[in-house]
């Protein structure tokens, strides 16, 4: 299972590579989304491609892609890695979802198919999702005192 530092490193690496580029296409190759339908919100999202990739960030183990679509509307893609997920720049047997960008393609791989992807155009829902994950131990100012308060 990818741990917090691995998720953070992946988000930072993706942000370095694709921030500011255009997302041209989202392709489903295999896995849960090929069998059970596209990720929630994807059909509406892809209607307005290309979309500018504003950022790739993380909060805990949640990876958050922020886009600005061709109609100047903001979208977010929420991604969790599950037990075996991650992003690669080369297609592999388990490269289930492909993001085609002006800086190349990036593949979401997930051998066990426990990870999730969801497209959302609601900033309040995105903020609520982030808040529901609790403090981010790599970003938030976490002290021993705050930790003790949270567990009381």
Spans of features found by a protein language model:
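Phosphate/anion-contacting hairpin/loop surfaces
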Residues: 72-152
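Extended, highly charged segments
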Residues: 1-59, 63-74, 90, 97-102, ...
